[in-house]
Amino acid sequence: IQKDGTYSVVPRMWGGLTTPDELRAIADVADRFRIPTVKVTGGQRIDLLGVKKEDLPAVWAQLNAAGLVSGFAYAKGLRTVKTCVGSDWCRFGTQDAMGLGVKLERLLCGSWTPAKVKLAVSGCPRNCAEATVKDVGIIGVDSGYEIHFAGAAGLHVRATDLLGHVDTDEAALEHVA
């Protein structure tokens, strides 16, 4: 619930990725329900702000019909897996950050945790997904991935601790999931 008594609706976008059809569905919902603010979040999602309580069931029904599910933006648990474009699109990318991020988010979605958990996968040491200030961060390097833990980007910024190095996507998933 927002400070004016309206609600925020944040559909999940696995690894920060979306499609033209999903974007059209979000735009259609914003138009149909006269949602006053549509904002891209720091977690690479789209937040529909100012949704009236009585519209929530219909908003979610329309989004669900388009294949969109809740991003659990305010839940205690897995928030998002932020990704950079990685080796698919970036000239510096050494690893497939988007692919690994989507796998990781799907694997962990619905997990219960005592507090919010933010994750990121960067495709190279340039760290465009800000993996070193997340609870769990994975950074692509030439020989695989570095696994990082215990970062924070809130009031008390803290860089992660390096846990170690793994060679493959599967090993990265095994170590963090």
Regions found by a protein language model. Name each.
Residues 1-3, 34-40, 153:
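Short, flexible, solvent-exposed loop/turn segments with mixed acidic/basic and small polar residues
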Residues 118, 123, 127, 132-177:
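Mobile "lid/hinge" segments at catalytic clefts and subdomain interfaces of large enzymes
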Residues 1-6, 18:
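Intrinsically disordered, low-complexity polar/charged tails and linkers
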Residues 9-142:
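Small-residue-enriched alpha-helical segments and adjacent helix-cap loops
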